[in-house]
Structures are given as C-alpha cells and as structure tokens.
C-alpha cells in the first residue's frame, strides 16, 4: 500500500521539500495536483522527515497541498529494439511525434560494470579522420572527451564519427541544446544514413535543468543493456558535459550546498566519473565506447569541468581552429592497437610527422619575429603546409592506410630520407621508390 503525503513545506525553483518517511535516494515520486494533472519527481536528499525532491517539468502550478506518492522504485527508462530511430526528452517521453514506445522499463541508476567481467581494450575504432586514426587512435570501450574551444563545430565532428564507425548502435545524449543543434542532429543522422540505428535523448536549453542531469544516465542505461544482453557494440555520444555540470551547479545552489571551485558542487568529480566509468568492453559480450563534448568557457582548459574530466578519461581530442590540435590531444590507449592492429610503420611514421610538425612551428615563430631562415627552416615550413592541408584538415576523409601512404609522400616531397629520423628498414620498405634518398 502506498502512503500519500500532502505536506509540501517548501517550493524553490524545480525543487520541493515534503515531510515524509521511508524515502530512498533516487526513488521515483508521483505528484498529483489539484487540477488533475500529475507529474513526477525523484528523491534528491533527505534529512530526518524532510525529503527534497527534484520535479521533472518544473513546479509551475504546484501547491503545498498537492498529493505526493512515493512509488518505491528508481527512475526508469524504456529499453528494447523499439527505441531505435526514436527521440526522447529528459524524462523519457517521446518527442518525435510518433506512437508511444513500448519495452522493458529499466532503472537509470546502476553501478559501474563488474571489473571482473571487463576485458582489456584491444580493437581499434576507425573514424576515417587522420588526426584520430593516425595520431590518437580511438579504441573500442574508450572514454574520451572532445575539448572544444568556443565557436568550434564539434557537433559536426560527432556526427562524422557516428556515421563512419562500425558501431551497431549509436546513442546520442544532448544537453542544453538549442533548437538549431537539435535539428542538426536529426537531419544529419538521416542524411548520413544511420538514423535507423540511432537513439536520441535530448534536453533543450528551455527545458528544466533537472532533466539535463538525467540525460547521460538514460543514454548509458540503455547502452549497457544493448551491450550486455544483445552483445552490441554501442557508441555513446554526449554533448555538452559542461551544460550537464552547469545543471548540477544550479541544483546545488538551489539546495544551499556549499560551493566548491567556481560555484560547482564538491561532488563534481564523482558526478562525472560515475558516468564515464560506464564505458566497457564486456567479455563474451558487446562494448560501450563513450565520446563526449566538453566546451571550455573562455577557452580555459583549467575550468573545473575540463580539468576534472582530464583526470577521469583516457585522453582527449582538443578541437581548435577547426582542427584536432595534435599537441593538445592524447589517446592513452593508442599503444594497445598501434603496430598490433595497424601497419608496422604506423607508430614510427606518426611520431616522425608530429616531431617535424613541432619543429615547423618553431620555424614559423622565427619567421614571424624577422629572423633569417635556414634551408632547414624552409623545408619545415613547406612540410607544414602539406601536413596541414592533407592530414590535419577535418575535411579530409580517408582510411588509415591511405593516410599512412600520404604521410610518406609528404615526407618524400619535403625531406631526404636521412632527415626524417625513421628506422632504415621502414625507409627501405615504405619510402617512395622514385628516389630512395630524396
């Protein structure tokens, strides 16, 4: 038998406080209003008989005498094949104007996957983007963010990755999206041909902040079931985790929590980590690969959100000036696949290209300061132009093997074979044969 409580003592923003007993954290609550409407909330915290609830859809029209019913179960989302091709809001309701979605209700808050059942990542995820495939390989079950400067088109990069990987299912979690962003995701998924294997959970900028916090949990709960029960390789794309953190910040301020760095709650690190740790490669099962977007306010990489994220994830892609910056990017799992799942020259060639590109930046700096350039400086600057145009541009869309061949051609056009610092046996095998020492 469910107990009905009618003593709401405080309404503040999207949070209400009710006097009740026996509540548990994360428990789902139904609120029946005097006008006949009903809404849902979840338990955020409790102190003796005072229980704080976050109300989905806002508290507009709520009165202190409305009925509050604790349902004895956590927030749930529908799981099943019927999700594919559908779009949902932060409470799990369809927003694509189609029929109601039917499936198995599953809780959205579950522990991270059992470490005993995890396996060491060993499969490369190909994106056909040279700055990822060649220099910072994406590995199946990796958790990695895209650190995006202001004004960068990170959404287009996400959709390219979604379309060009071999993932069985793509789940997109959008937080704080404008209508333009939301429409872009819908149209691009259709244009690129993966809409039928895509599930979207969308929180728009005009929606309640409490719904924003639920988006990653819903996306990852469904991904975990697809990976575990159907052995699917699932790609989860979350954008924007800074909007997620801002929603946490707003809720913490409303609850009068003592703020930490720049007003964010002291639990920010844990709140991020518990989501990122859902990435997994399951023994005799599927996998979850997680790519997120973290925008950096004021291009500040020391901002609490990217700063905490960097300690949790396995590297990052640094998007700047419409390129993936090789010096700010890192994949901590690339050594598991480079040379093992890829061509033997991959590691040496990538290292040589990045080393020479770093030297070319120094030459460009000397040129800008008016210093006289040596012949070596001129070679480096010519190399830099070729490298940026043929490999760094995000317009380039080629498989890894072709990117490696282009890398050799760029070296051949810019240097003598003795100048690039690559092992002689690789030079003999891969250096263009027209002139071995040119």
Swiss-Prot record:
Keyword annotations for this protein? Answer: ATP synthesis, Hydrogen ion transport, Ion transport, Transport
Keyword Transport listed? The answer is yes
Pfam families xref list: ATP-synt_ab, ATP-synt_ab_N, ATP-synt_VA_C
Coiled-coil segments: none
**Which GO biological-process labels does this protein carry?**
proton motive force-driven plasma membrane ATP synthesis
Per its UniProt entry, which superkingdom is the organism in? Bacteria
The family database entries (PANTHER family) matched by this protein are listed as: V-TYPE PROTON ATPASE SUBUNIT B
What is the protein's given name? V-type ATP synthase beta chain
| GN (gene name) | atpB
């Amino acid at each position: 038998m469910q107990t009905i409580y009618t003593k709401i003592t405080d309404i503040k923003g999207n949070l209400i406080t009710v006097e009740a007993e026996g509540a548990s954290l994360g428990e789902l609550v139904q609120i029946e209003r005097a006008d006949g409407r009903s809404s849902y909330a979840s338990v955020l915290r409790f102190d003796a008989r005072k229980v704080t609830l976050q109300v989905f859809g806002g508290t507009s029209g709520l009165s202190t005498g409305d009925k509050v019913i604790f349902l004895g179960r956590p927030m749930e989302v529908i799981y099943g094949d019927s999700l594919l091709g559908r779009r949902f809001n932060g409470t799990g309701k369809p927003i694509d104007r189609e029929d109601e979605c039917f499936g198995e209700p599953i809780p959205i808050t579950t522990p991270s996957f059992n470490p005993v059942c995890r396996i060491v990542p060993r499969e490369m995820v190909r994106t056909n983007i040279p700055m990822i495939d060649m220099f910072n390989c994406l590995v199946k079950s990796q958790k990695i963010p895209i650190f995006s400067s202001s004004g960068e088109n990170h959404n287009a990069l996400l959709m390219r990755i979604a379309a060009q990987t071999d993932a069985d299912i793509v789940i997109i979690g959008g937080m704080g999206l404008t209508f333009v962003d939301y429409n872009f995701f819908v149209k691009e998924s259709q244009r690129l041909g993966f809409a039928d294997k895509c599930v979207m959970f969308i929180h728009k900028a005009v929606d309640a902040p409490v719904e924003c916090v639920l988006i990653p949990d819903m996306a990852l709960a469904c991904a975990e079931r697809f990976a575990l029960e159907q052995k699917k390789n699932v790609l989860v794309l979350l954008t924007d985790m800074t909007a997620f953190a801002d929603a946490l910040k707003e809720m913490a301020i409303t609850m009068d929590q003592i703020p930490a760095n720049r007003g964010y709650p002291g639990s920010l690190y844990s709140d991020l980590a518990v989501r990122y740790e859902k990435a997994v490669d399951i023994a005799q099962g599927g996998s979850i690969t997680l790519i997120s977007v973290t925008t950096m306010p004021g291009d500040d990489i020391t901002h609490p959100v990217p700063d905490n994220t960097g300690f949790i994830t396995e590297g990052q892609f640094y998007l700047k000036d419409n390129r993936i910056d090789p010096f700010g990017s890192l994949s901590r799992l690339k050594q598991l696949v480079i040379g093992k799942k890829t061509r033997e020259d991959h590691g040496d060639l990538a290292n040589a290209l990045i080393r020479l590109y770093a030297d070319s930046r120094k030459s460009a700096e000397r040129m800008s300061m008016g210093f006289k350039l040596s012949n070596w400086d001129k070679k480096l600057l010519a190399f830099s132009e070729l490298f940026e145009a043929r490999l760094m541009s995000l317009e380039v869309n080629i498989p890894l093997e072709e990117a490696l061949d282009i890398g050799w051609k760029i070296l051949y056009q810019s240097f003598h074979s003795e100048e690039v610092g690559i092992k002689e046996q690789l030079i003999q095998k891969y250096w263009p044969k027209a002139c071995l020492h040119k």
